[in-house]
Amino acid sequence: MKRFGFLYEKVVSVDNCRLAILNASQNKRKRKMVKDVCDNLEDYAKDLSERLSRMDFLSPYKTRFIKDGLSGKERELQIPAFYPDQCAHHAIMQVLKPIIERSSYHWSCANIPKRGIDHASKGVERATVRDRKHAKYCVKMDISKFYPSIPHGKLKARLREKIKDEKFLQIIFKVIDSHEQGLPIGNYTSPWLAELYLQPLDNLIKQKHRIRHYVRYADDLVLIDSNKRKLRKALHDIFEFVGELGLSIKHDYQLFRIQQYCKDRSGRRGRKIDFVGRCFGVGFTTIRKRRASALMRQSRFIQKLQRENRPIAYRIASGFISRCACFKHTNSYAMRKKYCETVNIKKLKEVISNESKRKCLSQLAHH
């Protein structure tokens, strides 16, 4: 395995720090602190470089609790200060990112840019739509409390396998040790370090067990193959390997036959793969019931507002258009026709356009 060196000089360079501040400030430049830093970019870039050199770039986290989307799960966020914390995280990751991306599995999604829900969905549809012959059985599992459970010692050992620059390692170790246990949800570095930590698991599944189709979305794993015995054996080894990583698989893991139409037209047998908000069967993809219900409610509400000529909020308009876009990637023609096409999308786009213009004018006024 190739180990990388001469990274410390890249991280602490003023050019890298300047770029890190600009990247960290994206979509935040209305905030007073961010505006002050950007207005004095050169001074702060030099200061950040010095802080990284003397390992003085961390301050206490602010804790915040949120409810995560439609799932309703409560999550604890650790929010770092913009300067110097977030800027330092970007400076570190600008150097570390290419190393992690270089060895990442193609169907490892969520933690890497341009590999979101649609990319994960394509990975599953490679099996269920394009390779139906081998899309017979599925293993679906989830790592329990993934971010908070990652052991610092084993993560540091994993970093040492990839990097030989001791000074750079001390900087990244300081970020890891800034949180008592696991990786904090909210740090820019956390998803990238989590991706690096699970890369050996991806290699085990694809190279040792040669599972025909495997997709991972953060800590959710889907394995698809025509051989049930092979999946059982892989499942056993995954449990052992994940245990060695200091993690654990949730008890509700499943091994089941994938839903498909029967040739005698007696209906369907098997179950759909419920993954990334969509349900996959052999030859078709639909939206998860909870997401479909949310779209139906929002569609009726918007239709009522449009009938009464009442104004529609930007948040509602943008959310509905986003939900409708999800239906384009699924076999949900009847629902799209009933709930999306009955809404005046042109009016919603006008609301979004007007809000964008208002934001642009507001930014110009500030300058």
Language-model-detected regions and their locations in the chain:
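Non-catalytic, polymerase-adjacent accessory regions of viral genome-replication enzymes
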Residues: 1-46, 364-367
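Active-site-proximal segment of RNA-dependent polymerases
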Residues: 3-8, 89, 93-151
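N-terminal accessory alpha/beta regions
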Residues: 36-52, 68-69, 194
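Conserved polymerase palm-domain catalytic core
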Residues: 51, 125-218, 222-237, 257-258, ...
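Reverse-transcriptase-like RNA-dependent polymerase core
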Residues: 51-73, 87, 164-178
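Conserved pre-motif C helix in the palm subdomain of viral-like polymerases
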Residues: 74-105, 180-206
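Right-hand nucleic-acid polymerase module
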Residues: 86, 90, 178, 232-239, ...
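Beta-rich nucleic-acid/ligand-interaction surfaces
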Residues: 110-120, 222-224, 255-264
